[in-house]
UniProtKB/Swiss-Prot annotation:
Keywords: Cell inner membrane, Cell membrane, Heme biosynthesis, Membrane, Transferase, Transmembrane, Transmembrane helix. Converts heme B (protoheme IX) to heme O by substitution of the vinyl group on carbon 2 of heme B porphyrin ring with a hydroxyethyl farnesyl side group. This is Protoheme IX farnesyltransferase. PANTHER family: 4-HYDROXYBENZOATE SOLANESYLTRANSFERASE (PTHR43448:SF7), PROTOHEME IX FARNESYLTRANSFERASE, MITOCHONDRIAL (PTHR43448). Carbon 2 of the heme B porphyrin ring is defined according to the Fischer nomenclature. Its main location: membrane. The keyword Transmembrane applies. Its EC number is 2.5.1.141. The gene is ctaB. The keyword Transferase applies. It is found in: Cell inner membrane. One of its GO terms (molecular function) is protoheme IX farnesyltransferase activity.
Amino acid sequence: MQETSLTKAVSPRQSLGQILLNYYQLTKPRLIVLFLITTAAGMWVAARGEVDPVLALITLLTGAMAAGSANTINCLYDRDIDYIMERTRHRPLPSGRVQPWEALVFAIALAVGAFSLQTLCANLLSACLEMAGIAVYVGVYTHWLKRSSTQNIVIGGAAGAIPPLVGWAAVTGELSWAAWVLFAIIFIWTPPHFWPLAMLIQEDYAKVNVPMMPVVDGDRPTAWQIFGYTLVLLPTTLLLVYPLHACGLIYGAIALVLGVVFIRKAWELVQTPEDKDQARAVFKFSILYMMILCAAMGIDSLPLTHAVVSQVTANLQTLVGTIL
């Protein structure tokens, strides 16, 4: 094969540290952090706040490995368009610091390691869910939809919604309705999280013919879609409180406040869809939203929290009884 910018040999002068950094960058570690947060939330809610620390550590480790595998394959598949876009052309594959076959071997090793370790230390269901996440992200999003549909991030977003299922299955060995609500929360959250970012970098997507919604439909229709998803997201988060009773009032109150703020910010974007600062504000808040929401799930699930809430409730009932 004729040598191109995408098939140049890796420089023999790279230090061990640079080589390790290359593979670390292939995994897109900043994306993995959010996956691990939602995995932990699933575990803590499923276990009512009493999670085996060893199981938690292993599940988070294998989750990071599985996500790293999926992200590496994504980098491998997209290396042609990454080379064209200025913000991505210096990544390990388009820059030639890592060869395609090396990235593929690395991705396979991560996937095999994740599946084996999770099966041995947790259970087969959670391990299979990790592999399903890889399959959906690579097959459905990266290969099928990313370059062909404006709904790429909506349908492909199912991959990012799988981590809480992994966490839940690791603890219980099954998937309850509450687990699927966690899946739905992440699934519905993904478009209003990603589309504001797509609005900011739509010129890059247009350059490489990736049909992200802002590129094809424009900023205003995209802003309305973002607003619509935030409206659906708020009641979905509250399903964990009622009727499922998987989370309590502390989580419910925080989810309500977060949801209202998210809706307000999305509405402000509808008013000024061409305002890049507003799109950036929605994107940044979406990350904060998910981090606080998952933290609220974890705190609400703790036995200490249940004890405090029960005691406060009992005291209030006694006070009301005394007054009446």
